[in-house]
Amino acid sequence: MGLSTASVYPENTQAAFRYAAELGYDGIELMVWAEPASQNIDTVQSYAKRYGVRVLAVHAPCLLISQRVWGADPVAKLERSVRAAEALGADTVVVHPPFRWQRRYARGFAEQVGELEAHHPVKVAVENMFPMRADTLFREGAVRRLERRAGPGRAVSAFSPSYDPTDTGFDHYTLDLSHTATAGTDALELARRMGEGLVHLHLADGRGAAHDEHLVPGDGTQPCAQLCEYLVDTGFRGHAVAEINTQNARTTAARSALLARTLEFARRHLTGATPDPQPRHADLP
């Protein structure tokens, strides 16, 4: 079970390694974004060595807030992400479908993904996203509206050709359970469509709000436990990674508790085990 460095924001990348070591996570998914340390492979390698936590995956800098990280060319950024994963010993790169305005990138995206996988020992796992919903402007009642409509209602996709990567078809996928909530997508059905190509799970939850929530699994309406059990039953051998929002945690202890709950959920439903309840503070420098 891995921990996304995004899960500790507004704390930094080093803090994510520290939490992972303390709580007993197996590894890290590195979110490459504006923080300089996240962009520096030598720095990340030093964290991995110091805390004894390996890097499982690299999340390419493809968010709206990271459009200028590692340059402005998304083609070059994806290639650099794959090379970074290789250098860090990670076997997976997580990437979003191209934005609609990235026309050249979008036209060649599927071909580039295939070529990168053919020439590097890294899986490029394309992540399911969600549409921009009209009720984003009216957050009150958004969850009830989604339930009533059995879908997101009036919405527009910012992604080309779709926010659902199975509409295009790739060899490898990332399934995000917060994104399925916002999109009104059946997570189990999406997992079945992804099939053996599902190699990476962002374990989170959501209630169907118009915005992306990334709740602790079990705190929303997504079939998190059922999906984990489905993965066990189908022989899933990829990475499950906690990608939750802890911005509202007022203290490190509160943030640690949220991360520990997520790890306990994963251990229970993916392995039938529970983590050591005593963080390993004494082992850290």
Predicted segment positions?
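Short, structured patches in soluble enzyme cores that scaffold and shape functional sites
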Residues: 97, 126-130
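Glycine-rich, proline-tolerant flexible connector loops at the mouths of alpha/beta enzymes
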Residues: 29-50
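Short active-site-proximal "capping" loops at secondary-structure junctions
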Residues: 33-38, 61-65, 247
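Short, well-structured secondary-structure segments
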Residues: 26-33, 54-59, 93-94
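N-terminal small/glycine-rich loop or linker at the start of catalytic domains
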Residues: 1-3, 56-65
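Glycine-rich anion/phosphate-binding loops
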Residues: 39-40, 68-80, 103-108
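The substrate-binding groove and active-site-proximal loops of carbohydrate-active enzymes
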Residues: 31, 63-64, 68-71, 99, ...
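Histidine-acidic metal/acid-base catalytic patches
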Residues: 1-2, 9-21, 49, 79-91, ...
